[in-house]
Structure formats: C-alpha cells, structure tokens
Curated annotation (Swiss-Prot):
Reaction(s) this enzyme catalyzes, per UniProt: uridine(54) in tRNA + (6R)-5,10-methylene-5,6,7,8-tetrahydrofolate + NADH + H(+) = 5-methyluridine(54) in tRNA + (6S)-5,6,7,8-tetrahydrofolate + NAD(+); uridine(54) in tRNA + (6R)-5,10-methylene-5,6,7,8-tetrahydrofolate + NADPH + H(+) = 5-methyluridine(54) in tRNA + (6S)-5,6,7,8-tetrahydrofolate + NADP(+)
Alphabetical UniProt keywords: Cytoplasm, FAD, Flavoprotein, Methyltransferase, NAD, NADP, Transferase, tRNA processing
Cofactor dependency: FAD
A cellular component annotation (GO) from this entry: cytosol
First-listed, main subcellular location of the protein, grouped into a coarse class: cytoplasm
Stretch forming the signal peptide: none
InterPro entries according to UniProt: FAD/NAD-bd_sf (IPR036188), MnmG-rel (IPR002218), MnmG-rel_CS (IPR020595), MnmG_N (IPR040131), TrmFO (IPR004417)
Organism the protein comes from: Bacillus cereus (strain ATCC 14579 / DSM 31 / CCUG 7414 / JCM 2152 / NBRC 15305 / NCIMB 9373 / NCTC 2599 / NRRL B-3711)
Family from the record: Belongs to the MnmG family. TrmFO subfamily.
Subcellular location: Cytoplasm
UniProt name for this protein: Methylenetetrahydrofolate--tRNA-(uracil-5-)-methyltransferase TrmFO
EC number: 2.1.1.74
Matching PANTHER family: GLUCOSE INHIBITED DIVISION PROTEIN A (PTHR11806), METHYLENETETRAHYDROFOLATE--TRNA-(URACIL-5-)-METHYLTRANSFERASE TRMFO (PTHR11806:SF2)
GO biological process terms, semicolon-separated: tRNA methylation; tRNA wobble uridine modification
Amino acid sequence: MTTQVVNVIGAGLAGSEAAYQIAKRGVQVRLYEMRPVRQTPAHHTDKFAELVCSNSLRANTLTNAVGVIKEEMRLMDSVIIRAADECSVPAGGALAVDRHEFAAKVTEYVKNHPNVTVMNEEITDIPEGPTIIATGPLTSPDLSAKLKELTGEDYFYFYDAAAPIVEKDSIDMNKVYLKSRYDKGEAAYLNCPMTEEEFDRFYEALIAAETVPLKEFEKEIFFEGCMPVEVMASRGRQTLVFGPMKPVGLEDPKTGKTPYAVVQLRQDDAAGTLYNIVGFQTHLKWGPQKEVLQLIPGLENAEIVRYGVMHRNTFINSPNLLRPTYQYKQRDDLFFAGQMTGVEGYVESAASGLLAGINAARLVQGEEPVVLPPVTAMGSMANYITATNAKNFQPMNANFGLFAPLEKKIKKKVERNEAYAARALETIRNFVNI
C-alpha cells in the first residue's frame, strides 16, 4: 500500500465517488467537507451526496445516454449508483431515490471505509500533493478566489448561460438553409426563416411561457451581460428582430428574399451531430421551452439534447485547462471533478468523480492515468469537456450526440441508440479491473 494520501475536497456526488474509488484501490484519502461547519445556500444536511434539486437520476434504460452511463458505472463499482439502486423509489423508466436514505447510504459507505479520513473543515487554498477538487456549483468564495487565481480570470465562471442544443438528424432540412451572414467566410449556420405571422406566433408563446423561479443566490446572474431571450422579448417584439433573430444578410436562397426573422443554429460538436440555437440562453421551464422551440420552422420535431439554462454554477474552462483524465494540464497531481468541470447532472458529476478517483489512485501508485474512449458514455463526457471549442464552452449532460459516430449509419433512433449502448458496454468491460 502506498503511503501517499490523496486530498479530496468536497463530499458531493463527485467527491464521494472519487474518495471511494481511491480508497478501494488501497490508497489513503483525506475527504474534506465544510458542511456542517459552513453550509451552502442550497444544502440542508451534513450528509454526503445530498441531492439539492430533484430526487431523480433520470433515465435508467439503455436507449438513453444517461442510462448507459449508469450501467457503465455499475460495471465499474460506482458507490453512487449502488446506493441509488438500493434506495430507489418507483419512477417508471427512471432511477429516482429516497433522497435522505440515499445520502445516508453514500455517507455510510464512504465514511466507514478504513482508508477514508473525513475532515469537517473549509478549505480556502489549494493543497499541495495529490488533490481532487470537487466542490460543486456553490464553491465557497475563498476557494473560488484561489481557483480563479490558478486558472486565470478568463477561464473561471460563476454562472451558466447556455442555449438549447438539438440533434442535427431531427432538424427538417427542407425548411432551413446553410448560410453565414452576408456570406462572410464559409457557410457555417443553419438558418430557420420566419414569416411575420410565424414570428408573431412564436413571440406570443415565448412571452407567455413559464420560467423557472430564481433562487435568492441566483438573482445577480442576469446583470452579468448575458440576457435570457424571454427577458429580451419582454422589452418589445422588435428587440428580437434587431437582436438574436435579425434577418439582415441572410436572404433565403430558395426565394431570394430576406425573411421577417431568422433563428440561427451553429454547429456545437466536431462531428457535426449537434447544433445550438444562437442567442437563445433562457430561463424557461423545460416543458414550455420545448413547446416554444418547436414553433421555429425546421425544429417542429427537434430532439433537444440540452435545454437552455441560466443558473449559478461555478465551473472552469475545461478545454483549456484539463486533460481527458480530469488532470489539470499545469499540474499532474491536481484533478477536478463534478459540475465544476462542465459535466451537467447528478450522474455525470458522479461519473467524472469515478474517473478522477481512479486516475488519482493510479498516479500515486506509479501507473499511467486512464483515458476512456469516446465510444463509452464516460469517455464521451471526458472528451467533450476537454476537446470541444473552448471559446463557447458550456456545461453539458450525457447524450448520444457526444459519442464517437457509429461505423454504420442506423436510421431508426431506438436501434441507433441500442447500438451506441451495446458498443459502449462492450468497450467499458475492458476497463472494469483498472
């Protein structure tokens, strides 16, 4: 057994998973959790892996990417998924848990491991020696300041302002056209043209749609220079036509005329399977958001892989800062995990902790850190946060659009997703003993 100790800062989903993975590999862990000494605005207990929002870990089927990532984690002996399975409550095809039992179970498994020492204190500086930072979206101000100092002001963010992302295969290509404004450079945008009548229908639905209520600690985010599309719309219908939906320079090649308004879609991934809706950061609830977006010509049947969000979320610019091993590029023994890395969601956060934990243990044991291939769900997430365009980087949930493309194109969605899942699970089995 190595005498080196790994520091894990934060006992949320990612930190708890990381600590467990390190400990089970025979490495000592110091797990720092500032609760209950200092609470966050969202937490209510001193338990590890407290679920502060929904009690659902989302889909549990293999036709959904988050279901695949769960199955990969089961094969890799994830403490988070084991506890979730043991504390599950009826939820149809989803995995939902009794949140109190779940947090208690994770706390018990991690705290009682002989290689884990729990330190209930706030960390305000980045420790020397092997360390995983998994402090989550509500990282304390003092540590945030140190992380900002470490990563550089331009690479450290305090809130999400993400536009929705759709699957290219679900866009009606007969209704959209490829063009850049004024034909500058290569044709890089898919354009969804609107008549005045279509715009009016869209506008009325947008301003009437229900928004997510802001929590007290989130109320400052709209003053940071990034405004939700529905707030812009509330200032008058022309605000959008002269803003994110301006049609000038975007003549429709089919008619030769300039539409009344245009919604632009920009490629979001290297493979060209995902497109984001430009300028559509939003605080709409997901149900109404889908209804509004499907009023856009060409997006009537759009598959939304990430909904637009605006919320408090401390995260780093991982493409500039991290390797797909979750190591910090400038310091081999420093790892990041959880939502701070730009993975979005309970399961994705835990999965990043699993891989960061495995790699931290391997590092102190003198072994090479592991990069999971992007044909796996966990590997595709690590690849997304480290290889995507750094300039427009925003957090992302697991989705099949991030997976490496299949060798053979499969038209039917369910069959295609099953093929992604089968390939992922076949591949991950090669890594279960690392």
